[in-house]
A protein has these predicted regions:
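Long, Lys/Arg- and hydrophobic-enriched amphipathic alpha-helices
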Residues: 222-398
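Active-site-proximal flexible loops/turns
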Residues: 112-114, 142, 183-187, 271
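Short helix/loop capping segments that flank catalytic or ligand/cofactor-binding pockets
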Residues: 60, 181-184, 271, 385-387
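A short SAM/SAH-binding and catalytic strip from SAM-dependent methyltransferases
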Residues: 165-191, 237-242, 246, 250-261
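A mobile, often basic/glycine-rich helix-loop segment
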Residues: 174-222, 275-285
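Generic detector of well-ordered alpha-helical packing
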Residues: 106, 136, 178-181, 265
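Rossmann-like AdoMet
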Residues: 2-106, 110-170, 331, 340, ...
Length: 398
C-alpha cells in the first residue's frame, strides 16, 4: 500500500481578513506556477521558501504585522527588558575584554532586542563601536530603524545593517529565534526506504506527494539512525534543516574570536527523533494560533520547526568552536543575574510590580517559555569567563 500524508483543514483557526486572503491567494497562484514549471511537484523545502521568503510576495517580505499583539506570534524580547538585559550582560563581557569587539544580531524582528541590549550596555558603560543587524525582511528593517530612532536616538548611529557575517569577525553573534525559521525538508521513513515530502496541487488546493528521497536526504536519515542506535519506525514523519546547518558552519568559519549564542525552541537529537515524536516538529503560527498544517494560508502564516541542537553544536565544533554550554531559557535568565531585577522591587508601584512578575513568569516557567526555549553557547579563541553556564549546564545531552 502506497504511503500517504493527509492535509489537515483550517477548522479552529481564525478567518483571515479580506486583505490577507487576497495576499494568500496571490502566493498560492505563484507556488502553483512553480509546481507547473517543475512538472508535477516541488519539495516541501521549496514550498516553504516561496511561502515565507519569495521577494515581494512571501510572508516575511510583505506581511505588515508579523510579531507582536497584532501579529502571529510574540518573541521573548517583546515581553520586556529582562530578556535583553540577560543578553546584554554577556555582550558586556565580550566588549570589555576584546578590543574592537562588535555585536551582530541575526533576524532582529521588531528591533526590541537591539533597543534593550543597547540601553543596558549604555547603563553599564560597555557600548560597542558597532551593532550589526542581518535582516532579510525590508519591512522589518524599516520597523527596526523607526524603533531605534524613537527609543534610543542617541545610539542609532551605532547600528548598521549588513548582508552577511564579516570575515574574521570579532565579537558576539546573537541569533534569537533564527534557526527555527530556515527552510527545511520533511521526510517519511518506511520499512524499506526514505520518502521525501513534496507538495503538488489538486484542483484548487495543495496536497502532499511522497517520492523516494534524494541521496542527501536519504544519507542523512541513515546517519541519524546510526547515531540514535535504531531504525525509525514505519511511517515516521520528521524534518531536517540543511540550511540551518549551513548557516552555523558559515558563522563558525567567519568568527575569528568571540561568542555565538543560538537561542530558540528546540531539543537534543535523542528527543527530536524519539519514537513517540513520529509526526515531527513542524509548527505554524497564524494570529496567535499554533497548528501543524503548513499548506493552508500560504504567505500569511509562519512556518517553523523545532531545532535539533545536537547537529548544530556538532557542526560548530567541527568548524573550530568550543561548546561552552546548553541551558533552558529559565536557567539562562537565572544564571544571568535575575535577582538584579528585584533590587528596587519595593520601590515600584503596584502596576510595575505586577508587570515585572508577569515577565519573569512568562520567560521562566516551564509551561510558558522557560523549558522549551534553549540557549546554546559557543566560543572561539575566547574564554567565556562567566557564570552563565556554571549552574545546570546540560551540554552533556547534545
Amino acid at each position: 500500500m502506497k504511503m500517504k500524508l493527509e492535509t489537515l483543514n483550517s477548522s479552529g483557526l481564525p478567518e483571515p481578513n479580506d486583505k490577507d486572503l487576497v495576499k494568500s491567494n496571490c502566493v498560492s497562484r505563484f507556488i502553483k506556477q512553480q509546481i507547473d514549471k517543475a512538472g508535477a511537484r516541488i519539495s516541501f523545502r521549496d514550498f516553504m521558501q516561496h511561502a515565507l521568503y519569495e521577494e515581494g510576495l512571501g510572508y516575511y517580505s510583505s506581511k505588515a504585522n508579523i510579531i507582536g499583539v497584532n501579529g502571529d506570534f510574540i518573541t521573548a524580547p517583546e515581553y520586556g527588558e529582562i530578556y535583553a538585559n540577560s543578553l546584554a550582560k554577556q555582550c558586556a563581557i565580550i566588549t570589555s575584554e576584546i578590543k574592537g569587539a562588535t555585536i551582530l544580531e541575526f533576524g532582529a524582528g521588531t528591533g526590541a532586542l537591539a533597543v534593550g541590549i543597547l540601553k543596558k550596555l549604555k547603563e553599564m558603560r560597555c557600548l560597542p563601536e558597532h551593532y550589526f543587524i542581518i535582516e532579510i525582511s525590508k519591512n522589518l528593517i524599516d520597523h527596526q530603524k523607526r524603533k531605534l530612532k524613537q527609543e534610543v536616538p542617541e545610539l542609532a548611529s551605532i547600528v548598521s545593517w549588513i548582508s552577511s557575517v564579516p570575515e574574521e569577525f570579532t565579537g558576539i553573534v546573537i541569533a534569537n529565534e533564527v534557526a527555527d525559521a530556515f527552510s527545511f525538508e520533511r521526510f517519511v521513513r518506511t520499512s524499506n526506504e526514505v520518502l521525501q515530502v513534496c507538495v503538488a496541487k489538486d484542483k484548487e488546493k495543495f496536497r502532499y506527494d511522497l517520492i523516494p528521497a534524494n541521496n542527501k536526504l536519504c544519507d542523512y536519515v541513515v546517519f541519524l539512525e546510526k547515531i540514535i542506535g535504531h531504525k525509525l519506525d514505519h511511517g515516521y514523519l520528521s524534518e531536517v534543516s540543511f540550511e540551518a546547518q549551513d548557516w552555523v558552519k558559515e558563522v563558525a568559519c567567519k568568527i575569528k574570536s568571540g561568542v555565538f549564542l543560538i537561542l530558540d525552541y528546540g531539543i537534543p537529537r535523542s528527543e527530536y527523533y524519539a519514537p513517540n515524536r513520529n509526526q515531527g516538529w513542524t509548527r505554524c503560527h497564524f494570529m496567535h494560533h499554533a497548528h501543524n498544517e503548513p499548506l493552508i494560508y500560504p504567505g500569511i502564516q509562519d512556518i517553523t520547526t523545532w531545532v535539533d541542537f545536537s547537529i548544530l553544536s556538532e557542526i560548530a565544533s567541527d568548524n573550530g568552536m568550543k561548546i561552552d554550554g546548553f541551558l533552558n531559557q529559565s536557567q539562562f535568565i537565572i544564571n544571568s543575574g535575575i535577582e538584579e531585577n528585584f533590587q528596587n522591587f519595593d520601590k515600584l508601584d503596584l502596576k510595575a510590580q505586577i508587570e515585572l512578575s508577569r515577565q519573569i513568569k512568562l520567560l521562566t516557567l516551564p509551561d510558558q517559555m522557560g523549558e522549551n526555549f534553549k540557549c546554546l553557547g559557543l566560543s572561539k579563541n575566547f574564554n567565556l569567563n562567566t557564570n552563565l553556564f556554571k549552574s545546570r549546564d546540560r551540554a552533556y545531552v547534545l
